[in-house]
Amino acid sequence: MVMNRRATSLIKDQYYHLWIAASKDQLFFASDLDKAFFISLLQDCLSPRKRLSHRTTSDANYAAMIDLIAFSLTNFGVNLLVYAVSTTSVQAFGQQLLTRYASYVQAQKSWEVLPFDSIFVHDLLADEHEALAVSREIHLLHDDWEYDRYSSIGFYLHDRRGDWMQAWHLANLFHNDSLWYRQFMLDDSHIGVRQFEFIET
């Protein structure tokens, strides 16, 4: 099932919040190994080096179309913040992630109940300032938000690096100052500023 908030296929170069989850409150990740595999999917889809190297699969590489700005992997799903050239590329990217993860899960003997039918939702954001607020929301989904390895917080606070992540889109707003971003994370005045509104289309 694919959902979005508004018809935007002709709008170029926008920020999007993507959410991928199992339906009916099922687990999306059964273990940290599953989360690690999903991160490897993000790297494979978004690394420019993967795009330029010889590829052994027919899956598309989205490095030229999508910049990953922030991410969060919890037991119940995936939140991604991206900058993309079009809604069409966002839809194709989300579907590829979901399809490849479904194939991985179906091959795992550790799963008693598969987390599919799953849903993929994408929400067009107003601008980089709304994207900054969303980055805070998805990082705070983790109890140990400051150090959780399955979110992108390390790219903002601890100088974590990778060519598949493009945190500079937001870091430029606060001069790449990790102390500023940490204080931003701790500032409760941002709570409730934005609410997600997803409408099935």
Please annotate each region the language model reported.
Residues 176-182:
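Short, highly charge-biased, low-complexity peptide segments
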Residues 165-171, 177:
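Intrinsic, low-complexity terminal and presequence regions
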Residues 1-158, 164, 184-201:
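Short catalytic/metal-binding and nucleic-acid-binding patches
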